[in-house]
C-alpha cells in the first residue's frame, strides 16, 4: 500500500512539474485517471498537501484596450455564443499588456473558439494597427482558409481601423457591446491565465525575455499540453486532432 502511494506521489510530482507547477488536484487527478490510475481528486489533494505542493499562480495586473468606437454600426454577431461546432467558424482577438523593466510590450492573440487554441500571436513594442494585421495574416496562413468566418474583438481603435477591415474583408466582423468586456471573455480569460500561471512569476528584463516566455507558454504548454475542461480535459491541439479523426470517420464517438 505504501509503495503504491509513493509511486502515485511520484506521478503527481511529474505531472505537476510538467504543467509548470500550474495544475492543482482536479487536473492532476484527471491526468492520472487518463493513464489508468483509479484515484479520487480528494486523494490527490491530500497527497499534494503532504508533499507541500500546490498550484502556483500570481494575480494578474489587468488592463485592456479602450473602446474607441461607440457607434451603432458595430454589431455583436457572436452574442456570447462561445461554442462553435467546428474549427475556423469563430475566431476572437484581443491585445494585452506585459510589463518589463524596459517598459510595456503588447501581445496580440487570436483564438479559435472551437478548441480555445491560440492560432496566432504577435508580441510588439507598440500597439500599432500593423501588429493586429500581422497577427491576422499569420492566422490566415496557418489555418489555410479563405472562408467567411466570424472574427470577434472589442472596439479598440486597432479593430475598427480601415486597415483591419481590409485585412478581414472576407470575414464577418463582430464586436463586443458597449462597455461589455465579457463579450470577449474567452480570449481575455486566456490572457489572464497566461499572466496568472506564468508571466507574473518573473521580473521580465526586456522584450526578448518576454517573447521567450510567451512562446514557451503558448507553443510548448498551452496549445500542446495544458488540459482544458471545455475540451474534455485534453489540450486544444488534441481536441482539434480528435475532431479531424471523427470527421474523417477514423473513430466513432460514444453516445
How would you describe each model-predicted region?
Residues 99, 103, 121-144, 160:
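Active-site beta-loop-alpha junctions of metal-dependent nucleic acid enzymes
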Residues 48, 127, 175-177:
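Methionine-biased hydrophobic packing positions in alpha-helices, especially
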Residues 12, 28, 44, 48, ...:
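Mobile genetic element proteins and their domesticated derivatives, centered on retroelements
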Residues 1, 38, 82-83, 100-101, ...:
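Conserved, non-catalytic sequence blocks in retroelement Pol enzymes and Pol-derived host proteins
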Residues 80, 84-119, 125-126:
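An active-site-proximal beta-strand-loop segment
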Residues 169-171, 193-255:
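C-terminal domain-tail junction helix/linker
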Residues 64-68, 153-155, 161-165, 175-195, ...:
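RNase H-like two-metal-ion nuclease catalytic core shared by retroviral integrases
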Residues 1-86, 180, 235-244:
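Basic, flexible linker segments flanking DNA-binding modules
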Amino acid at each position: 500500500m505504501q509503495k503504491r502511494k509513493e509511486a502515485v506521489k511520484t506521478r503527481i510530482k511529474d505531472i505537476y512539474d510538467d504543467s509548470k507547477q500550474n495544475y492543482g488536484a482536479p487536473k492532476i487527478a484527471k491526468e492520472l485517471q487518463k493513464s489508468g490510475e483509479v484515484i479520487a481528486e480528494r486523494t490527490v489533494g491530500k497527497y499534494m498537501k503532504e508533499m507541500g505542493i500546490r498550484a502556483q499562480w500570481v494575480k494578474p495586473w489587468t488592463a485592456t484596450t479602450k473602446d474607441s468606437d461607440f457607434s451603432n454600426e458595430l454589431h455583436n454577431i457572436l452574442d456570447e455564443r462561445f461554442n462553435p461546432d467546428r474549427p475556423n467558424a469563430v475566431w476572437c482577438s484581443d491585445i494585452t499588456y506585459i510589463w518589463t523593466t524596459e517598459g510595456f510590450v503588447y501581445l496580440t492573440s487570436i483564438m479559435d473558439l472551437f478548441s480555445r487554441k491560440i492560432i496566432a500571436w504577435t508580441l510588439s513594442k507598440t500597439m500599432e494597427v500593423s501588429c493586429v494585421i500581422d497577427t491576422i495574416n499569420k492566422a490566415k496562413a496557418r489555418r489555410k482558409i479563405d472562408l467567411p468566418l466570424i472574427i470577434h474583438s472589442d472596439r479598440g481603435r486597432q479593430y475598427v481601423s480601415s486597415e483591419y477591415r481590409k485585412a478581414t474583408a472576407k470575414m464577418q466582423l463582430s464586436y463586443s457591446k458597449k462597455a461589455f468586456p465579457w463579450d470577449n471573455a474567452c480570449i481575455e480569460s486566456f490572457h489572464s491565465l497566461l499572466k496568472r500561471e506564468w508571466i507574473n512569476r518573473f521580473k521580465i528584463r526586456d522584450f526578448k525575455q518576454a517573447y521567450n516566455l510567451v512562446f514557451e507558454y503558448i507553443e510548448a504548454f498551452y496549445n500542446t499540453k495544458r488540459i482544458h475542461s471545455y475540451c474534455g480535459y485534453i489540450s486544444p491541439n488534441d481536441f482539434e486532432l480528435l475532431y479531424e479523426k471523427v470527421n474523417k470517420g477514423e473513430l466513432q464517438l460514444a453516445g
